[in-house]
Amino acid sequence: MRSAFKNEHSFEKRKAEAERIRQKYPDRIPVICEKADRTDIPTIDKKKYLVPSDLTVGQFVYVIRKRIKLAPEKAIFIFVDEVLPATAALMSAIYEEHKDEDGFLYVSYSGENTFGQL
């Protein structure tokens, strides 16, 4: 999935912003969260998040659920590099493993446990 954030901002601008954020908030992780293509789940109101490094993926999913006001019976899945990360994994570990060359961690969310087409 191509990130809309990447399309809207140049690499240099994104890299400079991520570096500035990491210097100012060394214990936080800059995350870009966008809705996956072809899902009927609501669109999130903001894409940029500064998450504590000790936050788990499960806790981050909870934050996303609240932001999109998702009904409790509806499922939500988040993907990093088209992979479903473990719920108990720390966002700092996911960041170190999957951060983009611009310094942001790109996360997409969907109402289905699939990525792309079948």
From Swiss-Prot:
GO-annotated biological processes: autophagosome assembly; autophagosome maturation; cellular response to nitrogen starvation; mitophagy; protein transport
Xref: Pfam families: ATG8
GO cellular component entries: autophagosome membrane; cytoplasmic vesicle; fungal-type vacuole membrane
Keywords from the named record: Autophagy, Cytoplasmic vesicle, Lipoprotein, Membrane, Protein transport, Transport, Ubl conjugation pathway, Vacuole, Virulence
Propeptide: 117-118
UniProt-annotated site: Cleavage, residues: 116-117
Quaternary structure (record): Conjugation to phosphatidylethanolamine (PE) leads to homodimerization. Interacts with ATG1, ATG3, ATG4, ATG7, ATG12, ATG32, ATG34 and the C-terminal 10 residues domain of ATG19. Also interacts with the endoplasmic reticulum to Golgi v-SNARE protein BET1 and the vacuolar v-SNARE protein NYV1. Interacts with the UBX domain-containing protein SHP1.
Described function: Ubiquitin-like modifier involved in autophagosome formation. With ATG4, mediates the delivery of the autophagosomes to the vacuole via the microtubule cytoskeleton. Also participates in membrane fusion events that take place in the early secretory pathway. Also involved in endoplasmic reticulum-specific autophagic process and is essential for the survival of cells subjected to severe ER stress. The ATG8-PE conjugate mediates tethering between adjacent membranes and stimulates membrane hemifusion, leading to expansion of the autophagosomal membrane during autophagy.
Record protein name field: Autophagy-related protein 8
The organism of origin for this protein: Mycosarcoma maydis
